[in-house]
Amino acid sequence: MATSTRSRKRGAEPDTEVVKRAKQNKLCSLQNNDFLGFCSLREINYYETLKLDFERNFEAPQNDADFALLVARKANFVANQVRRYPSVTDAHHNNAVHDVLILIQHARAVLMDKNKRRRYDDIVAHKNSNVLKICDTFISQLDQINVDLSAALVAFKTASSSLSGGAANDITSALVEALENWLAAQPVVMRRPSSMNRVLITWPPLLEEQVYTKFQTEQLIRQELLASASIKSEDIVNVFVCDINAVVVEFKTQEQQLAAMKIDEIKSNRFTVKPYILKNFYNAQLSRRLSDEMNAIDIRAQNIREQLKTVHARYSQS
């Protein structure tokens, strides 16, 4: 019997697909009155379409007239399963009514004509012999798989029974230790943060540059870097405009930072490019400012303490 209509879904689980195919194969059975609604119309042959026995007819053929009458009667019988539909565009389970009728019509036309039937019989016989050869190959392969699996199962049971609880624990510990050693041996790549790839660019601003907006100042520096340092636009992570003549630029890599610093080597260039290190910035500016403010707070606190002592002494005397 031909295989049933395949309606595979992408990513379907193997077990689900097997169950689904088995169910469809059961429905695509000559015992099912609606079998043409479930069978694959591309795979089923004309004898199966009309519920005829190909092997019986091939080995002991009837006379042409009797066989033609049998074909006509069978065609009329199997067509009953789609006569209940009002339109040929309706669906007969998994197949269109129109497609079912076309298949029945072709089967009837070929099998009622003795010359067409003879050529068709040769094709079916050849296909059947090929299918049998394929089945024989599969059966042989399955037999070998069964032998291999049986041997593997026996070996597994033997090995399992010979392992005591202590031996199993030793194996587990050895595996864990081996995994830890392997992990420890793996190289750890330390990525340099782009915040370390910054430069401080300063320059004497031209007269028109003194009234630039932050955006205009940023574009000025970007153009200079693209022209003088052979740096691509995508190499620049960010541009921080600090003043009309001071900008901090952050690059993706240290190589791009070093390329930008080569601008300093161009004598005709008015831009000064130095590595921008947060440590130096904080020491030079923020640390001094914070220290001054903390000293001022300490002086004020000392004055308040002295005033409180004076007030306390005054009330103690009274």
Curated annotation (Swiss-Prot):
Protein name (Swiss-Prot/TrEMBL): Uncharacterized 36.2 kDa protein
| Organism of origin | Orgyia pseudotsugata multicapsid polyhedrosis virus
